[in-house]
């Protein structure tokens, strides 16, 4: 396991719900470009290239990073819960998309509700800025509840047919019961299925209206 090294060298927990990130070893912008300092490579091994096999070391490193992330969020959340006694928690930022960590926050810290907006990252800042400015100008007369994330465009069947024709694709039209059977069969045979219906989701997560489906039981689909 790499968790002890990550906790000691990269992400240290401090008293009072605080933490410290060692940017000398882990630079976000350099890492995105594929550059790591020698000390980081010494601790965790060489970088995996896109076409390299995924080894047990890679799996262990990913699992350890997930565990350290969860422990850090619990560390911060525990302090927040003690200070506020709040029973509801709202999260934002890219880390808020980590479903496993969110589940632990709710299960282990006593929050009754954990809310993550569908566009919790940078893209959601546009709507947040608009709402903040509206409230600041005292123009917000109604508090609108966001029932779901399906705020994007929606198209009718003539538009579907026109798009398929323009792309030179031949379509087969099936009733719902036969469609579901066909999709299940294709998934079981290791095929990818693009599921398209209704309005497009707002945010980076595919939530069933613009989704690529695959059988998670298959090793070659992971």
Where do the language-model regions lie?
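Flexible beta->alpha loop and helix N-cap segments adjacent to enzyme active/binding sites
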Residues: 1-56, 78, 82, 86-88, ...
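Active-site glycine-centered loops adjacent to acidic/histidine catalytic or metal-binding residues
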Residues: 94
């Amino acid at each position: 396991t790499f968790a002890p090294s990550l906790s000691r060298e990269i992400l240290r927990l401090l008293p009072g719900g605080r933490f410290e990130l060692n940017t000398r070893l882990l630079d976000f912008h350099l890492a995105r470009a594929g550059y790591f300092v020698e000390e980081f490579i010494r601790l965790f091994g060489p970088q995996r290239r896109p076409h390299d096999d995924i080894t047990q070391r890679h799996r262990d490193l990913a699992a350890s990073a997930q565990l350290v992330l969860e422990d850090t969020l619990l560390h911060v959340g525990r302090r927040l819960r003690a200070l506020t006694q709040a029973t509801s928690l709202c999260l934002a930022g890219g880390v808020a998309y980590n479903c496993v960590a969110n589940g632990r926050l709710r299960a282990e810290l006593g929050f009754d509700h954990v809310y993550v907006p569908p566009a919790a990252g940078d893209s959601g800042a546009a709507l947040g800025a608009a709402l903040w400015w509206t409230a600041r100008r005292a123009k917000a007369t109604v508090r609108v509840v966001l029932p779901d994330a399906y705020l994007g465009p929606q198209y009718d069947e003539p538009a579907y047919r026109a798009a398929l024709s323009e792309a030179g694709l031949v379509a087969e039209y099936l009733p719902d019961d036969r469609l579901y059977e066909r999709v299940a069969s294709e998934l079981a045979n290791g095929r990818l299925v693009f599921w398209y219906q209704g309005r497009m989701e707002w945010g980076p997560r595919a939530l069933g209206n613009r989704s690529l489906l695959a059988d998670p039981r298959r090793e070659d689909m992971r």
